[in-house]
Amino acid sequence: MEVGIISMRYAKALMAYAEERGAEERLYHELVTLAHSFRTVKGFCAVLDNPIVSVNEKFNLICTAADGDHKPSEEFIRFIRLVLKERRETYLQFMSLMYLDLYRKKKHIGVGKLITAVPVDKATEERIRQTAAHILHAYMELETVVDPSIEGGFVFDINDYRLDASIATQLKKVKQQFIDKNRRIV
């Protein structure tokens, strides 16, 4: 079976189960943390794919990655036990991302990422969040990242769109125009 099909089936089943139990929001926060762990912890996927690591060790690792020192919800525990029992831990990252997408669509939550060369103050960040929420008619989750390599300006990713107003991109465009112009001369 394909990764997307398996992941979507598990995510839909988890969403239905969470709705039935009234635990959608808690599960959402646990899966946000788990998805963040997949992105930031090197080797996390490799450990889950490793057949030498026992199921109990994988279970404890996943629970720690999802909720840290706190005890995860009963719904999360049952879901992880099912995934491990069916030997689908390879797809867990995609299952969590699919669940997050389903939850955000259902609850009208937009996701944005603001990349700037210098830190942005809280007032500006909140104004951007409110403006995006007003335009999208949705609640906005906004992540801010400082990346000095853009040299100035900003890059704003929102739901699958990118607004790139960075100096680095503008300089690349000017450079490309000069290269194209010189090619015509030769």
UniProtKB/Swiss-Prot annotation:
Q: Which organism is it from?
A: Bacteroides fragilis (strain ATCC 25285 / DSM 2151 / CCUG 4856 / JCM 11019 / LMG 10263 / NCTC 9343 / Onslow / VPI 2553 / EN-2)
Q: What is this protein called?
A: ATP synthase subunit delta
Q: Which domain of life is it from?
A: Bacteria
Family from the record: Belongs to the ATPase delta chain family.
Role this protein plays: F(1)F(0) ATP synthase produces ATP from ADP in the presence of a proton or sodium gradient. F-type ATPases consist of two structural domains, F(1) containing the extramembraneous catalytic core and F(0) containing the membrane proton channel, linked together by a central stalk and a peripheral stalk. During catalysis, ATP synthesis in the catalytic domain of F(1) is coupled via a rotary mechanism of the central stalk subunits to proton translocation.
Pfam families per the record? OSCP
Q: How does it assemble?
A: F-type ATPases have 2 components, F(1) - the catalytic core - and F(0) - the membrane proton channel. F(1) has five subunits: alpha(3), beta(3), gamma(1), delta(1), epsilon(1). F(0) has three main subunits: a(1), b(2) and c(10-14). The alpha and beta chains form an alternating ring which encloses part of the gamma chain. F(1) is attached to F(0) by a central stalk formed by the gamma and epsilon chains, while a peripheral stalk is formed by the delta and b chains.
One GO MF annotation is: proton-transporting ATP synthase activity, rotational mechanism
Q: Which Gene3D superfamilies match?
A: N-terminal domain of the delta subunit of the F1F0-ATP synthase
Which PANTHER family does the record associate with it? ATP SYNTHASE DELTA CHAIN (PTHR11910)
- Cellular component terms per the entry's GO annotation: plasma membrane; proton-transporting ATP synthase complex
Provide the leader sequence positions.
none
- This protein's record includes keyword Ion transport: yes
- Keywords, A to Z? ATP synthesis, Cell inner membrane, Cell membrane, CF(1), Hydrogen ion transport, Ion transport, Membrane, Transport
Q: Does the keyword Membrane apply?
A: yes
Q: Which HAMAP family match?
A: ATP_synth_delta_bact
Give membrane topology per the record: Peripheral membrane protein
